[in-house]
Amino acid sequence: MSEPATSFTPEIPSALPSIPADATPMMAQYLEIKARWPEALLFYRMGDFYELFFEDAVAASAALDIALTKRGKHLGEDIPMCGVPVHSHDAYLQRLIRKGFKVAVCEQVEDPAEAKKRGAKSVVARAVARLVTPGTLTEDTLLDARAHNYLAALSRTGAEAGFGLAWVDVSTGDFAVTSLAPVALGAELARLSPGELLLPETLDEDEDLAALLAQSGAALTRLPAIRFESGQAERRLKSHLGVSALDGFGAFARAELGAMGALLDYVELTQVGRMPALMPPRRVAATDTMAIDAATRANLELVRTLQGETAGSLLATMDRTVTGAGARELASRLAAPLTDPAAVNRRLDAVEWFHDARDMRARLRAGLKSAPDIARALSRLSLGRGGPRDLAAIANGLAAAHGLCAALDGASPSLLPLPEEIARECEAMRGTAASLQSRLAAMLAEELPLLARDGGFIARGASPELDETRALRDDARKLIAGLQAKYAGESGIAALKIRHNNVLGYYIEVPPRHGEKLLAPPFSDSYIHRQTMANAMRFTTAELAGLASRIAEAAGRALEIELALFDELAAATLLEAPSLSRAAEALARLDATAALAELAAERRYVRPRLDASFAFDIRGGRHPVVEAALARTGQAFVPNDTSLSAESGGGKHIWLLTGPNMAGKSTFLRQNALIAIMAQMGSFVPADEAHIGVVDRLFSRVGAADDLARGRSTFMVEMVETAAILNQAGERSLVILDEIGRGTATFDGLSIAWATVEHLHGVNKSRALFATHYHELTALSEKLAHLANATMRVKEWQGDVVFLHEVAPGAADRSYGIQVAKLAGLPAPVIARAQSVLAALEEGGNHEARTKLIDDLPLFSATAKPAPAVKVSAAEEELKNLNPDELSPKQALELLYKLKALAAKDGE
C-alpha cells in the first residue's frame, strides 16, 4: 500500500546561507535560486543528476535513504550534498511528496556551449521550471490513474458564517466551488479527499477547525490571508476566464471567490507562470449530494477498508471500468450520491439500457479499452510538459470517441432509443475535433519517444523538409561507416573504429599497441592525437571533423524541425481544449455507466425505484462486499428484508434490532446504508426489489475506536459521533446506530441508548436502524408508535448456538454471549464459571446474591481446576480422516452405517 499524504510540513530553513565573495559561480547561482524557494527542496540540475545542497541534502538523504556526501566548502564548512539521477527522478519525487515535502525543480535553460561563449568561467543558466506539491501533480508516474488528485482551498470572510471551498484537479482540469456551513466541512473534505489543502494563516486561530483539518489527511499549505481577498480574487478569476463579469458562471459568495482566487494564484505559482487547461468553474450546491461525514465513510468502508486497504472496499467490489478516467468517474459518483430523483433516474435509465443491450455493452467496453486518458494528456500539453505520446493519446482518444459514437448511433432498431444520458454523451463526442484527429494521425510515427527532444516522432512523408534533412543526416552516417573502412584499410589496423560521445564528438579509436603507429610518419601528418586511455588511444582527422560538423548540422536541423512541428501540433490541440475536455468527460461517463451495467448483470442486481417519498423498502437485500467475498468461496449470502417506510411499513420508520454478536447485525445495518448510497449514485442494487425515498444525509455509528491523539476514549468518540447525528439528522436522513452506550456502566449506557432512541423517534424522525444488546429497550415499541422490534434469528443445538443470519420481527430473548465466547475459544473453566455467574444473576440480582458470587470467586476460595483433557471419540477420529470428495455413493452409505455404529459404541 502506498504511503498516505500527510499534513506534516517539513522544516526547510527560511534563512539561507549568505553568498560569500569567494563562492564559486555555480554555488552563487544555487544560493540565489534557493533564496527564492526557501520552503521547498531544490532539485538543482547538474548534467544527468539533480543535486541538493546544505539542509536540503540532509533532509532529502534521510527521507530517501540515499548517501549524503559533501561538495566544496561554504564559510569554511563542508557543504552537504546528495543527488538523484534525472532519468529516474520521478520515483524519488513521489517518495518526497508523500512524506510532505515540496520540491522546486531547477532545470538548465541553455546549452553548455552557449554558456562557454560568455566566458570560460560562465555557469549554465538555470531556472525553476515548477514547484511540485501533493496537489499539483500531472505525471502519470506520480499519479494514480484511477483516482482524482484534488488541490483544494478553504476561505472564510468575516461577514459570512460559512466557508467557501474550491477544488481543482490540475491533471484533468476539473474545477468547482461550493459554500458550506461549518458543520458540513468535515463531510465535504472527506468526500473530496484532497491531496493538498490551501488555507489562510488566520484560520490557525480556530483550534477546533485546525483539529478537523489535521484529520482530513491532506497536506496543509498555509498562505497569507491577502491571497484569499475576494476583490483581488474576483479580478484574478475574470482575467483567467477572459470575461468582464462572472454572472454567466453563477452568483459566487465572497468566500467562494476567495477560495477560487487563491487556487488560481497557487497553481500559477507552482507551474511558474503557466496554467493548465481548466474547465470553467462549476458551482456545487451542498444540497445536490447526499451528505456523508468522515466517520460514516470510514465505517462503511466506501473506498478503503478500516485497515487502509483498497481491496475489500465497496469501490473495489463495484469497479468494472476499463479506463482510468472511467474509474475516476465511478469513484466520484460513489463519493457524492445525488439527491435529485430526476438526475438519479437519468443515470439509472442509462445503466438499464446498457444492462439490456448486452452485445452493445460488450462492444462499447472493448472500444473503450483503446481510449487513452485525454484529460491528463491535455493537461500536460497545456503546462508545457507534454510529449509526443500525449499527442498520440489525444488522437487515439478522439478516434475511440468517434468510433463509439458511430456504434451507438447505429444501435440495433430492436433496442430502445438511446436514453437522455447516453445521447448527451454521444453528442459531446460526435465529430469532436475530427480534423485535428486526422492531422495528428497523419503526422505522428507509430513508435514514439517519451520526450520531444529525443526526436523521431514525426512520420516519414509528413514533412518534405524534414524528410530531406533526415536523408542528409542518415547519408552522412553512412559516410562515417565508409570513412572507418577507408582508415582501417590505409593504416592496416583492422581494429580501428569511429565512435562518438558528447565530449569529443566523433573520434577514431584504436588499441594502444596500434596508437604508436598513427603517431609516427606518415600517419602523424593526418591523424591528430586527442586522448590516451588505459585500453585505447583516440584520434581525429580534418576530414572526420568536417563530416562530423555536417552530421551535427543535419541532425540538429532535423530535431529543430521536429520540435517546431511538435509545437504547432500542441498549439492546435490546445485550441480544441474545451471540446476535447467534453469528449474526455463523455468517455469517462460512458465507461462508468457501462461498468455499472456489467456489474448488475454479473451480480444479479436490480434497478431501484427512487423518488421523493420517505420510503425505504428493501426485499431480499444483500451486502455487496460480503456477498462477493462469500461467492469466491462458493458460499451464498442470506438476504433480508427491510421496511422503514411510514407509507408501507405500518408507520414504523425505526427498527430496534437485537440478537447475539456474530449473528449479522452489523452486516445488516451496513448493507442497508450501502444500498442507499448505490441507488443514489445511479447504480443497480443487490436486492430482489428496492424502493427508496431520497436520503439527504447518511449517518453511521458502527464500530469502536479511540482517538488517543486528541485525548478521547472509545466511549467519548462514540458520544461525539452520536451527538453529531442527533444534532443534524432530519426526516430525510438515514441513521445507522450500533451498540450505543456500551462503553460505560450498564445503567448509564442503557439510559443514553434509551434517550437516543426517543430523540430519533420524536425529534429527528429519521429512518433508522438501531442495533443493541440492551433488551430493555424493546419495551419502547409499546410506547413509541413508529418503532418496531426486529431480531437476528438463531438456533440452539446441543448447547451450541447456530447463527441463521436472518432478520425476523420480534425481540431476542437472550444475548448468547457465553456461547459466542465459547466459539471464540475461551478456556473451559472460564465458560463454566461464566455460566454459573449468569445463572446466579438471573435468579436474583440483589446485593446478597452478588456478595455470594464474590465469595465464590476462585481468588477467595480455591484455584480453579484445569479443564480435563477432551477425549476424541472414535466416530470423530473417523470423520477427521475422511475426504468426502473421494467417496462413491456406495462408500458414503457404508461409511454412514459405520459412523452410526461407532457413535453407539462411544455412548456406552
Curated annotation (Swiss-Prot):
GO molecular function: ATP binding; ATP-dependent DNA damage sensor activity; damaged DNA binding; mismatched DNA binding
Domain of life: Bacteria
PROSITE patterns membership: DNA_MISMATCH_REPAIR_2 (PS00486)
GO cellular component entries: cytosol
Cited Pfam families: MutS_I, MutS_II, MutS_III, MutS_IV, MutS_V
CDD domains per record: ABC_MutS1
Protein name: DNA mismatch repair protein MutS
